[in-house]
């Protein structure tokens, strides 16, 4: 059975005032709790990238670790984590970025990717784009052939794609737009 994108959107839980007052949080975990929704989401994302020659799916901690390995398996690719500092055991590279309330940093293993890799960089949600932009910069330091960027949800009103306007070589797509 094919579920519409509208049904997927309706199944996303909205949590007001989380993590701070005034924020409406879109909880994508409701898409994962039922096998039909999870399969539909997996199928849609697979169809988006099945002909792109993806060799590595890179997921951003932590919700990028849910669909990332599923996509990697479906695409016949490896999975690479991007994590917060101090969580990866071997030699890493890092990229820092500004957030609305301070700075943050993401890291990847130095040997995670190479110039032959076609990368699908995945996270659950595009809001302001800061985390993904830092992750994309980090991945590009390892010189892959091509970088695709994917989100389950894009919050259109926050214009997160705008931080990528100078990255003409990066293909950015989302499954659902809110």
Swiss-Prot record:
Pathway: Purine metabolism; AMP biosynthesis via salvage pathway; AMP from adenine: step 1/1
Enzyme class: transferase
Record-listed E.C. numbers: 2.4.2.7
Calcium is among the record's keywords: no
GO molecular function term, any single one: adenine binding
Gene3D superfamilies: 3.40.50.2020
A Pfam family reported for this protein in Swiss-Prot or TrEMBL: Pribosyltran
Any one of the GO BP annotations: adenine salvage
Gene Ontology CC: cytoplasm
Keywords annotated in UniProt: Cytoplasm, Glycosyltransferase, Purine salvage, Transferase
Reactions that this protein is recorded to catalyse: AMP + diphosphate = 5-phospho-alpha-D-ribose 1-diphosphate + adenine
Matching InterPro entries: Ade_phspho_trans (IPR005764), PRibTrfase_dom (IPR000836), PRTase-like (IPR029057), UPRTase/APRTase (IPR050054)
UniProt subcellular location: Cytoplasm
Main localization of the protein described in the UniProt heading: cytoplasm
Keyword Glycosyltransferase recorded: yes
Function: Catalyzes a salvage reaction resulting in the formation of AMP, that is energically less costly than de novo synthesis.
Family: Belongs to the purine/pyrimidine phosphoribosyltransferase family.
NCBIfam families to which the protein is assigned, alphabetical: apt, PRK02304.1-3, PRK02304.1-5
HAMAP family: Aden_phosphoribosyltr
Quaternary structure and interacting proteins, as annotated: Homodimer.
Name listed for the protein in its UniProt record: Adenine phosphoribosyltransferase
